[in-house]
Amino acid sequence: MDSLNQTRVTEFVFLGLTDNRVLEMLFFMAFSAIYMLTLSGNILIIIATVFTPSLHTPMYFFLSNLSFIDICHSSVTVPKMLEGLLLERKTISFDNCITQLFFLHLFACAEIFLLIIVAYDRYVAICTPLHYPNVMNMRVCIQLVFALWLGGTVHSLGQTFLTIRLPYCGPNIIDSYFCDVPLVIKLACTDTYLTGILIVTNSGTISLSCFLAVVTSYMVILVSLRKHSAEGRQKALSTCSAHFMVVALFFGPCIFIYTRPDTSFSIDKVVSVFYTVVTPLLNPFIYTLRNEEVKSAMKQLRQRQVFFTKSYT
């Protein structure tokens, strides 16, 4: 409580992506379009999964949860970034900064755990297909999703606690477009080396260990594909390569940023764009929208809408 009582900073000022007004307007238009595509693409997947019985499978249950997480994850940072691109002075209150930081880590950690679950789902489906219905039943799926949200909440509470326990009484300039633990604790009026080590132990270890676990699972899948038919091999390779692309795009920036205590590079802002803006956009296209089952479901939904419209005209 003493640390909190010593807090003097009431707001933080973002430097944003650039100080060039022309570039800011271009970025605003580009990121606005990306955000709209992110929302629409992920919402379409959720709707298709809910209203199409053929998609009521564990994999699409997890992917619809991924779409929900991507909507939330991008909504934590992108709207504030767009506001900053329009305004000359880019500020955020201390409380809102901590709130943004909490939800950023909640949704990011939930996505990390969900990507592990998706990898495990593919491992069971491809390597032990006969046991798949028993291993990945709906009860297990719901328990896994509950566990990932619980794990994400615990992680985020830990990161938030490490941040707010420090006194902030001096500089308030954040060289980014959003609040994150490594960026905020550098502004604390005390030595943060130990806190930085704890952050690496928390975020860095989670990112790196989970990435290695996912890579290992896909390597096991690739080895087991030798036992499958050529058609089955091709389908599994297509699915796994798409999944691994998302894993690399998301885990790469996280590992780059969260495994370095007390160090930062000018490229960090660009790297952050990948996992806060780009990955939530690409996930629906890489995972599902190019999938024939999802395309068929989308077509059925359009036909239902056409029938609904015609019946009232």
UniProtKB/Swiss-Prot annotation:
The principal localisation class reads membrane
Q: How is its activity regulated?
A: Copper binding enhances receptor activity in response to odorant binding.
In its UniProt entry, what is this protein called?
Olfactory receptor 4E2
Per the record, ranges on the Cytoplasmic side are 50-57, 121-139, 220-235, 290-313
What family does the Swiss-Prot or TrEMBL record give for this protein? Answer: Belongs to the G-protein coupled receptor 1 family.
- SMART domains, per this entry? 7TM_GPCR_Srsx
For this chain, the annotated S-S bridges are C97-C179
Of the GO CC terms on this record, one is: membrane
Question: Organism's domain of life?
Answer: Eukaryota
Check the record and name the PROSITE patterns matching this protein.
G_PROTEIN_RECEP_F1_1 (PS00237), G_PROTEIN_RECEP_F1_2 (PS50262)
UniProt keywords (A-Z) are:
Cell membrane, Copper, Disulfide bond, G-protein coupled receptor, Glycoprotein, Membrane, Metal-binding, Olfaction, Receptor, Sensory transduction, Transducer, Transmembrane, Transmembrane helix
UniProt-listed SUPFAM superfamilies:
Family A G protein-coupled receptor-like (SSF81321)
Describe its function: Olfactory receptor that is activated by the binding of organosulfur odorants with thioether groups such as (methylthio)methanethiol (MTMT) and bis(methylthiomethyl) disulfide. Also binds odorants cis-cyclooctene and tert-butyl mercaptan. The activity of this receptor is mediated by G proteins which activate adenylyl cyclase.
| Membrane topology summary | Multi-pass membrane protein
What is the name of the gene encoding this protein? OR4E2
User: Which terms does the UniProt entry file under GO BP?
Assistant: detection of chemical stimulus involved in sensory perception of smell
Q: Where does Cu cation bind?
A: H105, C109, R260
Mapped to this chain, the residue ranges on the Extracellular side of the membrane are 1-25, 80-100, 159-195, 259-269
Specify the species. Answer: Homo sapiens
